[in-house]
């Protein structure tokens, strides 16, 4: 039955207005309902106190208000980072992370259940892709975390489970809802979307001319090493991926971030650092060096701190911004 109900949390204002009118209500009700969903973040129709009980029943008969169920919260003793496990209405579970900074609260959300990209160092892809998340399921991760901590979320990164550009249309609707001034109203400049390098989608996103930051999971300085770490590189050459990043900057004026997980003995040599700086030479970019997270299903290990320092120093010497 749920499949036949309309997912109104995924609707923009125009669609919601059309839907409410089709149910026999007046246009102004749509604005009230949109506010209940996207400003007050209610979890049920019954919480909409200025809507008549009669029309609430009509809504229940025709629509569903997607609401994630908080299954578990793990809090880091080191820095207070909170990892959330949310249950979806089909029984699948997704992860989100809250990071608290001096400049505000940042949430990292998932865009899919599982992932089909197969990156060798990533645990999220071990069981493949189950499905893409709806816009409502993406944005409700932010709403639920905001309610849990009782504070405003100011920054969002789409870097959790899944390849965001593999769920492209839902991602765009999520961005529209997230940045709507009638909703939670998070600035496009405070949103980062990651990709493993789906070149046609990167170029398509560039043409949307949004003010969001694009983060490319690069993780290697040449094509052969990237193919060994990331199966997506069999479809897209590393130079085509970097060219797509240059195109993104040309279209949007937004500096691209390169994510580079340092894997001990695999991609962390001085030669790798030299190749990396040559690869992105002349670009207005940011390089984020990340010691890889070991997972039991793979035998990759972190680079030691001395090796990381060498990579960082080399990139700085070549006027490429590295971040540790």
Model feature map: region roles:
Residues 1-105:
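Flexible, acidic/Gly-rich N-terminal and inter-domain linker regions that tether
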Residues 41-44, 222, 320:
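Alpha-helix N-cap recognition
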Residues 100-137:
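Canonical Radical SAM [4Fe-4S] cluster-binding loop centered on the CxxxCxxC motif
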Residues 125-155:
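Conserved alpha-helical substructure of the radical SAM core
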Residues 146-155, 160-311:
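Conserved AdoMet/S-adenosylmethionine-binding subsite of the radical SAM
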Residues 313-320:
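Conserved small/polar residues in nucleotide/adenosyl-binding loops
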């Amino acid at each position: 039955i749920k499949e036949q109900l309309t997912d109104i949390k995924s609707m923009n204002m125009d669609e919601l207005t059309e839907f409410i009118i089709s149910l026999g209500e007046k246009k102004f009700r749509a604005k009230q309902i949109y506010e209940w969903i996207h400003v007050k973040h209610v979890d049920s129709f019954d919480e909409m106190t200025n809507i008549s009980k009669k029309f609430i029943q009509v809504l229940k008969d025709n629509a569903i208000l997607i609401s994630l169920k908080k299954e578990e919260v793990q809090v880091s003793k080191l820095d207070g980072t909170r990892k959330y496990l949310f249950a979806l209405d089909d029984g699948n579970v997704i992860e989100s992370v809250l990071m608290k900074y001096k400049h505000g609260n940042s949430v990292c959300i998932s865009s899919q259940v599982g992932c089909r990209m197969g990156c060798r160092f990533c645990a999220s892809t071990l069981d493949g892709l189950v499905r893409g998340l709806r816009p409502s399921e993406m944005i409700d991760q932010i709403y639920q975390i905001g309610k849990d901590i009782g504070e405003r979320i100011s920054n969002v990164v789409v870097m959790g489970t899944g390849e965001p550009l593999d769920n492209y249309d839902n991602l765009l609707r999520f961005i529209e809802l997230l940045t709507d001034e009638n909703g939670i109203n998070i600035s496009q400049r405070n949103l980062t979307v990651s990709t493993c390098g789906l070149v046609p989608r990167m170029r398509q996103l560039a043409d949307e001319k949004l003010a969001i930051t694009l983060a490319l999971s690069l993780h290697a300085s040449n094509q052969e090493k990237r193919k060994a770490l990331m199966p997506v590189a069999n479809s897209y050459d590393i130079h085509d991926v970097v060219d797509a990043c240059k195109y993104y900057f040309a279209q949007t004026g937004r500096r691209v971030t390169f994510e580079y997980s340092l894997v001990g003995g695999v991609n962390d040599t001085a030669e790798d650092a030299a190749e990396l700086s040559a690869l992105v030479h002349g670009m207005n970019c940011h390089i984020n060096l990340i010691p890889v997270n070991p997972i039991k299903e793979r035998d990759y290990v972190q680079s030691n701190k001395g090796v990381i320092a060498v990579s960082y120093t080399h990139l700085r010497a070549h006027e490429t911004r590295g971040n540790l």
